[in-house]
Amino acid sequence: MTNLKPSLIVLSLFFSVELFAQLTVRNNAYIFVDDQVLFVEDDVNIQENTANIYLRNEAQLLQGTGTTGNSGIGRLSVYQRGTVNNFNYNYWCSPVGNTSGNNNANRPFTPNNNIYDVTAAPITSSLAAYTSGYNGSSSPLVISSAWLYSYNPGGQYSDWDYIGAGGTVAAGYGFTMKGTTGSGSNQLYDFRGKPNTGEITVQVLAPVAGVPQSTLTGNPYPSALDARDFFHMDPENQAALAGTGAGALYFWEQNSSSHVLASYIGGYATYTIDSGGIVAYIPAPWATYDAAGNVTGGVGTSPNSTPGVDVPGRYLPVGQGFMVEGAANANIYFRNTYREYWKESSGDSHFFRSQDQNASEDQNVNEDTSNLLPSNYMRFRIVYDIEHNSQYFSRELLVNMADYATDDYDYGMEAKLSETFPSDAYFVCENVPFGILAVPFYLDRKIPLVVKVHHQQNVKFRTYALQNFPDDLPVYLHDIDNNTYTNLRIQNAEVNLAAGTYTNRFEITFQSETLGVEEINDTDLMVYQNNTTSELTIKNPNSYQINKVSLYDITGKQIFDEVKLPINTEYTFSTKKLSEGTYIVKVSLENQTVSKKVIIHN
């Protein structure tokens, strides 16, 4: 056991990493960890109330699989910065609990015991003050207790619970807190208390009469949390969250300038992550975006400002809170094995930033995941733009396409929307509105798109952030009623719609099937693979003019593109050098395109 006595101060700036089997800090001693990781295999005992551990400049505490639990009535101190002003909420989850009891259990978080005002000195802080008024202030730190709430499961339903300054929140559960005046959107908080460790249990509820039940939770540790491990390394978490679309984290976004509930502008961003660590994320539908996907405004504004957004990455930072929806009455679990040392400044770990503030750097909403896609994983985004009472917003939808996706619900690759609005757009999976969809790619794939319109108006459709798409592969919006195809890679689609919900009018396709006067059937044009001769064969008994023959693999990669073909009754193309697998043949005639799936075995 490492025992730090009153006369000994350990400064981690002398070491790259501190490693301990157990760690005890005694009376009037402290450990100062600067921009490093402190790893303790078993327990941390900050024994007396004058003993402290200070984590500074993104330093973090990691703990191993020991089962003893932390003890003592001293405090660990770790900073985290809020990202909203006094009118807007951050969702938090405290990394520490109160120090009112000396045992080995994680302690509840109490605002007026655990949140401190940061001063210029790196180890000196004082407890934050509280006001019952609606507005807090930054210097000195005064927090409005009016906005301190948790959202927890009850006997049957989940609901908001007021905690105020002196209430408690069990370890692993989250809480809401508004920002302060005088700090912009960057108030710095000092969380001080007993560090959480080990297995932490949070209750979730199954839907009630079809209505999802949410729990406000978050990262409960003084270190980053690997969201992939949280989603995929624990069968109990999968069972609790893997109902239709429930395997998602929901981050609150808000852009309000009033405390009046009716004036709130906000919604939930949707996040999920697959077993390979690929993040899928869409923002809440109140902001507007330009053609490049950059945020250009929010509801109630013309799209001319340039607020930014920090997108959650794979590693959830200290203090990050979020909502989850239960698929069953069960528990979800946080464990030390999910903890990682990952600094926010290193990328792929951001405390969620609402879009109500100016950012010093241009953040694209898919910036931190675009370089994570394997070559056989395609992705694109559809944006539905709408105006309502001179207010503009965009619903962003995401489509993931990979050969291991299915047409059913794929946990970690797709996610339901937390809510829909009178004017909205979404996909449908197992009769549930989805904002993130995952399907295998086929050239003849059709993706139905449901569109809702509150009142008659022009609506727009766009696409952006296409990843691993062949340059010549179109993304069409098919208006079934008008039988029109708009290639969204070339131009936006705009259509005037009467009020209503359109469930069967729009779909996303990758080929145009507009027919001429003469419709060609299978006997007029036969396309098949002759594996005996290793040839792709096209029989054209009526001698149609064939303008082009293209072959694509299952990922959409073009294998060949034959043009300016003479009129013949039969064409053959060698496939000897191609890998075995499924391919799509696309035959383009004057007024029609015929697609056929073939399987090549050499």
Model-derived regions: residue spans:
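Extracellular beta-helix/beta-solenoid repeat scaffolds
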Residues: 22-85, 189-198
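Extracytoplasmic redox metalloprotein regions
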Residues: 95-206
